[in-house]
Amino acid sequence: MNPISLLFLALAMSTDAFAAALGKGASLHKPRFIEALRTGLIFGAIETITPVIGWGIGQVAARFAESWDHWIAFTLLLVLGLHMIYNGLKHDHEEEQEKPGSHSFWILAVTAFATSIDALAVGVGLAFVDVNIMVAALAIGLATTVMVTIGVMLGRVLGTMVGKRAEIVGGIVLIVVGTTILYEHLTAAA
């Protein structure tokens, strides 16, 4: 795989995470750069690991992973999105109990995993082409780290504009990302 193709692959793999990061940034109360970078590093690390795992799976059974990856991504993003919408609606009636401006590591990790399912599938495909999987995985992880960090900071602007409804917007973004993943895989299979 040539360097230009690898760059485009890395950027394409980071787009779902970028969209989710916009939602995360919108749901945070004025995230600081360090919070955005922390989120970017979590997403980037997971997005680095999943193509390597996919590549390993591809060495064994490519068709199996391809048949269920989009359903896992859709389900995880749907559940996380609905949870964020619920929390956004709940905040209208109840005082916020959590520390503003933070998301737990596990929420971020599950979201990152859900948005990296496509990278897992790409890793499966990379098992059948001439590519250094470690270079490809590091490129995908670096692009994701940068894109997510930027996405969280841009999401902050969105959060300021929509106020209390920011978490609802973030949940809707996750559901849209999950639905898009499902739609793209189902229409590609048809």
UniProtKB/Swiss-Prot annotation:
Pfam families: Mntp (PF02659)
InterPro entries: Mntp/YtaF, Put_MntP
Compartments in which it is found: Cell inner membrane
Presence of keyword Ion transport: yes
Functional summary from the UniProt entry: Probably functions as a manganese efflux pump.
Family the UniProt entry places it in: Belongs to the MntP (TC 9.B.29) family.
Official protein name in the record: Putative manganese efflux pump MntP
The organism of origin for this protein: Pseudomonas syringae pv. tomato (strain ATCC BAA-871 / DC3000)
Gene name in the database record: mntP
